[in-house]
């Protein structure tokens, strides 16, 4: 379903915990990270689409979250031709999104990346509200910045923009570097709130929550 300008209606979700940290998901078998998002189906309202996408991508239900705010209008981004299927080139331009800011009132172990047979993410983590967007695919970065900026006014304590990096502490955002194996203790929240050990690679910091086997 496209509008007259070739944009697909879509919703984006910025999910906060009690510390104003933001949920980031690592795209399945890729090295990019993003917020939950998805298309609005015919007959759906943006809110209905948001709750559906929230469950499909994070396993959370409406009772696990509280809506804090939403963007006033659509935010748009164009998709480069190399990412567009050949049969829709010339018709499809990109996405127009309504963004929702949610507060999670459930527990971390309520998050399940395998809520459907077609998961979007294979790992997730919490990060500070303002972080560099290096790990987000380039053509989405401006929209992410616009959404974060507009919705920051709803935070209980306004989040401060990150200062310039001061040594290794600023490496906590999801940034891809060369492969380097290491053993970490993580939590597989798709099963129970318990600790397990896995081998980590390709990320400077392995996220603390991943899918492990079936």
Swiss-Prot record:
InterPro entries per UniProt: Nudix_hydrolase, NUDIX_hydrolase-like_dom_sf, NUDIX_hydrolase_CS, NUDIX_hydrolase_dom, RppH
Keyword Repeat in record: no
Nudix hydrolase domain: residues covered: 6-149
CDD domains: NUDIX_Ap4A_hydrolase_plant_like (cd03671)
A Gene Ontology molecular function term of the record: pyrophosphatase activity
PROSITE patterns cross-referenced by the UniProt entry: NUDIX (PS51462), NUDIX_BOX (PS00893)
UniProt cofactor(s): a divalent metal cation
Alphabetical UniProt keywords: Hydrolase
Coiled coil stretches, renumbered: none
Keyword rRNA processing belongs to the record: no
Motif (Nudix box): 38-59
Tree of life domain: Bacteria
EC numbers for this chain: 3.6.1.-
NCBIfam families named in the record: PRK00714.1-2, PRK00714.1-4, PRK00714.1-5
Protein family per UniProt: Belongs to the Nudix hydrolase family. RppH subfamily.
Function as written in the Swiss-Prot or TrEMBL entry: Accelerates the degradation of transcripts by removing pyrophosphate from the 5'-end of triphosphorylated RNA, leading to a more labile monophosphorylated state that can stimulate subsequent ribonuclease cleavage.
Protein name: RNA pyrophosphohydrolase
Gene source species: Burkholderia orbicola (strain MC0-3)
């Amino acid at each position: 379903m496209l509008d007259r300008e070739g944009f697909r209606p879509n919703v984006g979700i910025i999910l906060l915990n009690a510390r104003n940290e933001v949920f980031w998901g690592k795209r399945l078998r890729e090295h990019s990270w993003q917020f939950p998002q998805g298309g609005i189906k015919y007959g759906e309202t943006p809110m209905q689409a948001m709750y559906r996408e929230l469950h499909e991508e994070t396993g959370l239900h409406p009772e696990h979250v509280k809506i804090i705010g939403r963007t006033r209008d659509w935010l748009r981004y164009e998709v480069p031709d190399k990412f567009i299927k050949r049969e829709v080139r010339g018709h499809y331009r990109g996405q127009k999104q309504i963004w929702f800011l949610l507060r999670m009132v459930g527990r971390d172990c309520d998050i399940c990346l395998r809520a459907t047979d077609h998961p979007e993410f294979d790992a997730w983590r919490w990060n500070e509200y303002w972080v560099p967007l290096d790990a987000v695919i380039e053509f989405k970065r401006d929209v992410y910045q616009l959404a974060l900026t507009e919705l920051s006014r709803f935070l209980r304590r306004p989040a401060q923009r990150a200062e310039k990096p001061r040594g290794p502490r600023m490496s906590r955002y999801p940034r891809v570097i060369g492969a380097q194996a290491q053993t970490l203790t993580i939590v597989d929240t798709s099963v129970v709130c318990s600790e397990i050990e896995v081998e980590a690679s390709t990320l400077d910091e392995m996220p603390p929550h991943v899918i492990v086997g079936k």
